[in-house]
Amino acid sequence: MNIIFSPEYSGNVYIKPADATGVLMDTMVVNTVGLVNMLELRLGLHYDELFEQERVVHYYDAACRYMKEHPVNVLATSFRTSGLATAKAMLAWRDELRSAEWDFEGKDISDRLAVLIGVEEYFRKLVGCDWAGRLHIVTDQVGFQKLDCKHMVIKMPVAKEQLKPAIQKLIDALEAQGAKVETMPKAADSDNNLSKVRQLILSKQKGKITLNKNDNSLQIWKFADERAACEYLSYQALEDVDVWINADNKQMDNWLKLMGKPMTGSVMSDTTPQLTQLLVMGLGLFAQPLNVHTLVGWLQMPVHPLDGFFRSRLVNAIVEEGGYRNEACRKLVKEHAEGKEKLFEVFLPAFTASSVIYTADVRLFVKELSVWAKQRAHWMASQAENGAWVEQLMAVADMCHAFSILLDTHSEDTIDYQTIDSWMSTIGGKDVYTNAIAQRGCRMVIDHPCKMVSVAEKTVWIGVDGEASQGKECCFLYPSEKAGLVEQSYIHSWEEKEETNYHEQMQLMPLWMTSGQLVLVVRERIGGEPVLKHPLIVRLEQQVENITDIIHYPTIGTEGRHPVEMVEHSEVPAEMHLDHADKIKWPDHLSPTTIGTLVEHPFDYLMEHLLDITGDGMAQMADVKTSKGKVAHAVIENLFAPRGDNRCSLPDEIAIRMEQEFEDAYAKALEEKGAILQLAENRMDEKLLHNQLRKCLDVLLEILQMNELKVTGCECRLKVADVLGVIDMTLEDKNGHPVVFDFKWTTWTKGYQEILTKNRSIQLEYYRWMLQCDQKDEVKRVAYFIMPDAKLYSKEAFQGKNCIQFNPENNDNIVEQLRQSILYRKEQIANGIIETNGVYEDLQYVKDTIEKGLFSLNKNDEGTKEGNFFTQYGLFNK
């Protein structure tokens, strides 16, 4: 039985079969874990293995017990600040010391070691035998049981004397029972450049050598950055390469996919894929106030316990309303909850905010999420393409299991969110996940130089850059601690010389294991940052006289490229032409706002309302300014609107409501419409809104009193013909005539002053017309109430210091003009003609304005049509 062994072997290794069949019979490639597992099987030993997160949690439990018994110690302050993170660091120290055969002796050497020794008493009761213990037991049992190893041949890349002492003892024990230990053969020497450099490195000779510039056995390919390297290497066939070495193969796989070539298999390192955040996002729902971004992110997970149709509708409702705890969302949940009450109760936040978090609720959530993740992973595992998702779902289940153990250490009925967040920041950390699975016919790729088992004819080593040194064993120890442990033989540390030689041998394995050609790929920058030179490159630059002869700067040639005609638009044409315009479906109604967009900016209307192409994501929450406006509208409606069967609200009634109910109305509106303002980063904005809104409502009430106005409605929906509008506030003056107020939360006060002065207030004039049609009475006054300035802008007269009247330049009936313009624009779009912001005089609409009685367009100083200040399409329509 051939055992190819190295502590570094894991995942894919490069090994060539001994014969032409391509089959490795009676051969296994193992690292230390694999070797111990195989020997345990033969020795009849079995131990339960815990995954790393579970070990961390158990160690945290042990540390909690120790800290309770010994509250004064050198690590107590760190543990109180971040217990789980401290426990994780302590466990890493403990494991590294155990690998040096420490048996928890030397309490008197340092206070830090004394804490580790004390915690170990509790930890051993929770987890039993650890990995170092298993290695020690197997080593003893090989000799005690006289395991027959006569047919065992152990092949290693380095001599056993260079291994860690604990591993070396295991190899010695196997050798004593008849196992044959061999060092794997290296590439044969020749007179090429590669052999010369190999001898230079092995002999550690000083002085310089000169290489044959016509010999291609050793080449250095330099690229500006990782993108250039991956693009070139994926584009080239390079079919004669036996093995590729690439520590981070993700970008290369992406390029191979773009080139239509088989992917080689890669991982995402130090990352947290979206699906693995299920537990983190779900636990974030327990935070108060509720983070609406977390809720939307939780509902948008690609795989979720709740069905996708419901989640999509709920997200849309949250975005439209500005929050979750409102009537619209409550009604939607109720509609879909039948038969799923428990599911909704567990995986959705409560509609009533609570100041406490019950441990039982958190435990139930974690348990149900774990069960669902395992079931979903099992169901998805039947299809190979779901491999990455299955891996991530099982990671979620493991995190849930670890978190449930943490909850078991918490004895109180309630738990604060800071504790939950602290635990999750440690458990839900970054890890390695599958990016792509190797496809048939792909290149042979290994992720580390040390994983070359067989001699290769041609090797490409990508990433010969950066610091290659390894951290020394137990490097976290203070010199005094290490000296004390070594002097008293409490640890059997790796000899520094042997450790250095071992890492150097393994790091330079491509040099020893390549016979024909070795290509070293160097990237000068990674992620925009300059990289350190690899020790091998430094050595070559110092000792190779003609180093420039073997350095190449490859680029992709221009041959084979398809010529592409350059598209250049020096200026925007007056009109764009749209094919198949007859297929456009118009909405069944327009609003005063969309009418303005259609008439003045038809390109924007086409993109946003007909083609539904917008810059906002479907689940993008409104910004702070918009949220302030929503809250203000909701508070005004709550306090000013008529109640019950009353036809109107009088100023005196409103004054009492404001005095008694403002705080409650504000809190309710904030929860329902302005959840984004409750986030920590927006607290100053929220406090400012509270003060500004109260001031604005006081001014609004004063205006009602001074002008003898009473409120007849808020958020009044009216539909006249094919125009649908929602009027913010309808009022009635002392003569019984209707009045309209439209509320704006904006700092763009100059814009509203201009549209009133120029008689271009489309929204107000349409509201005037619609209310007149509805009530069969003339609406003599309409106005904008501008917040937070608390000013009333109108063309008509109102009494009060905060009321400003603007005299219009003309008294045109703009509603009739707009009606004609709507018909004109619809006809244009139906014929595929889309007006842009071209030269003003070139626009057909401008030419027809007077003749056809159209609503006039504005002209800017550059001689073109004035653009939309709020446009999302400036890239297309300048």
Residue ranges and their predicted role:
Residues 1-12, 142, 192-261, 284-290:
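Helicase P-loop NTPase motor core
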Residues 5-9, 18-19, 26-35, 153-159, ...:
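Conserved helicase core region in the C-terminal RecA-like lobe
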Residues 9-149, 160-165, 309-345:
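Basic/charged alpha-beta structural segments of nucleotide/phosphate-handling enzymes
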Residues 20-29, 34-38, 43-44, 234-349, ...:
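ATPase/helicase motor core of nucleic-acid motors
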Residues 150-152, 334-448, 632, 637-710, ...:
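Accessory C-terminal helicase-associated subdomains
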Residues 218, 459, 465-589, 795-844, ...:
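Accessory/regulatory regions of helicases
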Residues 314-332, 385-547, 745-747, 751-754:
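Conserved C-terminal motor-coupling region of P-loop helicases
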Residues 570-878:
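RecB-family 4Fe-4S metal-dependent nuclease core
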